[in-house]
Regions:
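Juxtamembrane helix-loop junctions of ABC transporter transmembrane domains
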Residues: 10-21, 52-61, 65-68, 90-138, ...
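Transmembrane helices of ABC transporter permease
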Residues: 34, 38-51, 93-95, 161-212, ...
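Alpha-helical segments in transporter systems
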Residues: 37-62, 105, 153-166, 188, ...
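Hydrophobic alpha-helical segments in the permease module
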Residues: 86-98, 192-196, 200, 265-286, ...
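Loop segments that connect adjacent transmembrane helices in multi-pass transporters
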Residues: 136-139, 212-260, 332, 351
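Cytosolic ends of transmembrane helices, especially the final helix of ABC transmembrane type-1 domains
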Residues: 239, 263, 280, 310-338
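ABC-type nucleotide-binding domain
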Residues: 348, 353-608
Length: 608
């Protein structure tokens, strides 16, 4: 039975995720698609449970009246049908309603909704641009997804379960008492109005504090994660105390916010406690007055007082439920600000890129990171199919930006990039990047096994292809000697977040093996050998030459000797091409390239 209710909702819908809407309610509703019928059923069972509970109070009052006036000899015979009905209600209906409510809430909605939010939000965020992740902490983004999903679950649960139970329960109480004498309902009605005023005054303030608290929690988490992620830098510069102070400042801001929330909650508790005492006093006073005037039976007086006492405990529970509700709303609002951001790079047409030759055309392109000028201005560059082109320039000249634009990590602000006469903006990002192999200076590795990291370039690769790629990248020898803390060896060893268990050169060789395995028709080498020593560079020279065969290659390097043998060298300065030609032609020209060459020696891609 549990499995049946667990499988009523698919937590992993296959449809492409849409941009979540702005606004807390619309944001939550967006993730409830396919669950709304069960949300309604949850509300109905919660309301039914509350109505039955009040009905039981009414029956107990009636029972008191019967026991005080009816004949013991004929009591069971006279009231048999009512007693049987109430017995069946208590022994059968109440457990069944409670069971259905729990199955819908605990098995169908809460686990599946939490995972559904995480699944859809994660898929949506994976399609965000590189700039989105560069502008925020990875830990902070992850915290928004994890905490936001729990908060959405809490909001939906309290709306459909808690508040449905409360609303139906309060209405049922008023109806029960008013049917006896409307004056018996007055204390509860007044209590309800005053309780609502307390909530109206306090809850918006709680909501604002909760949203601020969620943001400060994310900042605090981001700072802590940032320290852990860059622990080598922290230790290298002996800044442990600096990092603790940096984290402490965010913790203090969070703590101040917590004290604000707890202070407001304390005053709410004081006001509600005073109101509850007033309710019991007023209820007792009204009941005594009605009894003295023979307007209420002992049974209904017992019900009235019992309901007042029930409301006293009920109000404390409700106050904290509402407190949690608004805290969850604040968390949702904070998560929404990150998760609901529109994609900056969008697939306008889901057409695959078809690389037949590998011709690349940069046509009058411009990109300024949102500024008026700078970075790249009106750049034109044609790269023939199979041509090997080296990009040269000082730091900040725009070399890596040019590669990022080719990979469509950013959209052009002007101009056009074509691959085999196909505008890269009109093809899917996945197909574009699947056609380009990249080895960068900053090689990040997933926190998985060495094997998983390498076959990331080609998940369908065989073990033989994997071994061959590692051999060509001069990586097989050190991989076979790896062992992690769990005892995994060789290709099954976990390499750790960002490859912290490997040297820079080892990470670089794994990256080269990964691209060898990918075997894409276009190859980008962005400082691909910067982390390799001269001995290893020389060892993989032949491998890189084989890798470049039959491919269109764009290589970026500060060490000019590594790209001197390229078919053509392009010198970029301040986002514009100022020189291009072969190595010898540029030396003869005596320009920027010649000056840079004079300062450098060595290299692995020889001139012969």
């Amino acid at each position: 039975m549990l499995k049946f209710f667990e499988n009523l909702v698919d937590p992993y819908p296959p449809e492409p995720p849409l941009q979540p809407p702005k606004g807390v309610w619309r944001f939550c509703w967006h993730y409830c698609d396919g669950m709304k019928r069960y949300m309604l059923l949850l509300a109905l069972t919660a309301g039914a449970f509350a109505a039955i509970e009040v009905m039981v109070f009414g029956f107990m009052g009636q029972l008191v009246d019967w026991l005080s006036v009816q004949n013991k000899a004929t009591f069971l015979e006279d009231q048999a049908s009512v007693l049987w009905t109430m017995g069946l209600t208590l022994l059968v209906v109440v457990p069944l309603v409670g069971l259905l409510n729990n199955l819908i809430r605990m098995q169908t909605l809460l686990p599946n909704l939490t995972m559904r939010v995480r699944w859809l939000a994660h898929r949506y965020l994976l399609q965000q641009s590189l700039e989105f992740y560069q502008d925020d902490f990875a830990g902070r983004i992850a915290a928004k997804v994890m905490q936001g999903s729990i908060a959405v679950r809490q909001v939906v649960s309290k709306l459909c379960d808690t508040f449905a139970y409360v609303v139906v329960g309060l209405i049922s109480m008023l109806i029960l008492l008013a049917n006896t004498d409307w004056r018996m309902a007055v204390p509860i009605a007044v209590w309800l109005v005053l309780f609502s005023l307390i909530l109206i005054y306090c809850l918006p303030r709680l909501g604002r504090i909760a949203q601020d608290q969620a943001n400060k929690r994310a900042v605090m988490t981001g700072r802590v994660v940032d320290s852990y992620t860059n622990i080598s830098t922290v230790k290298l510069f002996a800044h442990t105390k600096r990092e603790t102070d940096y984290a402490k400042s965010s913790m203090n801001l969070f703590l101040v916010n917590v004290f604000q929330m707890m202070g407001l909650s304390t005053w709410m508790d004081v006001m509600v406690t005073s109101l509850n005492s007033l309710l019991i006093f007023a209820t007792a006073a009204v009941d005594i007055y009605l009894w003295l005037n023979n307007s209420a039976s002992l049974g209904m007086i017992a019900v009235s007082l019992a309901l007042a006492i029930r409301l006293q405990g009920f109000s404390d529970w409700l106050m904290w439920e509402v407190h949690d509700f608004f805290e969850s709303i604040g968390t949702v609002a904070d998560a929404m600000n990150t998760i609901s951001k529109p994609h900056q790079v969008i697939d306008h047409q889901d057409q695959p890129l078809r690389v037949t030759n590998g011709h690349i055309s940069f046509s009058n392109i411009g990109f300024h990171y949102g500024k008026k000028t700078g970075v790249i201005d009106h750049l034109n560059l044609q790269i023939d199919a199979g041509e090997k082109v080296g990009i040269v320039g000082r730091s900040g000249a725009g070399k890596s930006t040019l590669v990022n634009l080719l990979l469509r990590f950013h959209d052009l602000e002007s101009g056009q990039i074509l691959i085999d006469n196909q505008d890269i903006k009109q093809v899917s990002q996945d197909s574009l990047r699947a056609s380009i192999g990249v080895v960068t200076q900053d090689t990040s590795l997933l926190h998985r096994s060495v094997r998983e990291n390498i076959v990331y370039g080609n998940p369908e690769a065989t073990d033989e292809q994997l071994m061959q790629a590692c051999k060509e990248a001069e990586a097989s020898e050190f991989i076979e000697g790896l062992e992690d803390m769990q005892g995994n060896r060789g290709y099954m060893a976990q390499v750790g977040e960002r490859g912290v268990k490997l040297s820079g050169g080892q990470r670089q060789r794994i990256a080269i093996a990964r691209v060898l395995l990918k075997n894409a028709p276009i190859l980008v080498l962005d400082e691909a050998t910067s982390a390799l020593d001269s001995e290893v560079e020389a060892a993989i020279q032949a491998s890189l030459k084989r890798l470049m065969q039959g491919k269109t290659v764009i290589a970026i390097a500060h060490r000019l000797s590594t790209i001197a043998a390229m078919d053509r060298l392009v010198v970029i300065d301040e986002g514009k091409i100022i020189e291009q030609g072969s190595h010898q032609e540029l030396l003869d020209f005596g320009g920027v390239y010649a000056k840079l060459w004079q300062h450098q020696t060595g290299g692995f891609i020889g001139l012969n």
